[in-house]
């Protein structure tokens, strides 16, 4: 579903991404982990078509994000760790604005907005202006907007930052149901025990290079993901 082939990205003389290659398969939850500055956000924004890259190719469901960006983005949703929302809009207006861009039918959007707003406990706040919300509330609005158009590919950068424990639990259930229904999830996180329990596969990035990628159970062996990660980082 997501194919990353020999992708490199330069910032001046520094390689933020260095010949990165791996595949995220349809119907799996894939974790992308690494220290701050390792290249996680750079790759995520490149996959989403937000950031250009210098070498290589990224395919979404067989289509190039460079050559067919609209076709790719139609089946994707992206949630950042610090969502940039239209602060002066009401939450419901922003969510409907996103649904309009994806041509979501009225019946589908109403059902999904109600479902996720109730799940995240903000159904009574949808009429409020976004600028009055806390970071966690804004994160919930971004998640509802992303989920309401039922994307085939959900890409998230630190999606659990700012969420309360119930919202984290609910989000994990959403992720499981999404892949059960044929969707694909690719996300970065620093919460390694959660990635260990939730994900099918994982890639570990260090200084812009992939140092380990594969099945979560095989990479872990009889160790915790945290221990494996720290051992690889120490090399």
Where does each model-flagged region fall?
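Walker A (P-loop) phosphate-binding loop of ABC-type ATPase nucleotide-binding domains
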Residues: 35-39
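Conserved ABC ATPase "signature" region
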Residues: 96, 100, 107-125
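ABC ATPase "signature
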Residues: 213-214
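Conserved ABC transporter NBD signature motif
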Residues: 56-67, 71-72
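A short, proline-enriched helix->beta-strand linker immediately N-terminal to the Walker B motif
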Residues: 148-152
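Conserved ABC ATPase signature
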Residues: 129-136
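Catalytic Walker B motif of ABC-type/P-loop ATPase nucleotide-binding domains
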Residues: 154-158
